[in-house]
Amino acid sequence: MSRKIIITEKQLKKIISEITNKEITEKANEADKTPTEAQKKMGNYKMGHVNINGFNITIENPKGSYRKGVDKNGKEWKTKMMHHYGYFTKTLGHDGDHIDVFIGTYLKYDKIFVVDQVNENGDFDESKVMLGFKDIKSAKEAYLSNFSSDWKGFKEITSVSIPFFKKWLYDKKKQRKPFYEYVDVKKENDSH
């Protein structure tokens, strides 16, 4: 005699999240933590690849690694990554690169948070996504923790539903202006 085991949606989310957090870290740790500048420019180094709740993500910098580079003035910079960092595959952001994502551990989310980042002149630079964070406050704190204390690139953070975010993520026309400026984002947030 066979028995049916019934689990609730809440229990399933917990099981999936626990498995996923472990798998994400394992995949993230496959990434080369010290690629050369040439390798970074060409994207020619080992990276981690994960699928988180339907999003295909490449992890460039695992939590605890250092992200470094050279700014426009030739000054070297380096920052320790407090969260896994990578990008959504098959996307194109305002800056001409893939849309970047920081990955938290709270994967039982129903919201995604999008940060609009500005350059030194205060002009829109790009949007960065905060995936797996409990609320807007923790998402903002997580974003800022991955930059130096004198970072001035944070402009705005917006909370949005997953279905709406998916629609925006794969519409290449949408990344031309800050996320928070979209009328449909404002309408969605006003309805909550």
What are these regions (language model features)?
Residues 1-26:
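Protein-protein interaction and targeting regions used for scaffolding, dimerization, and localization
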Residues 23-192:
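Hydrophobic N-terminal alpha-helices or hydrophobic patches in metabolic proteins across all domains
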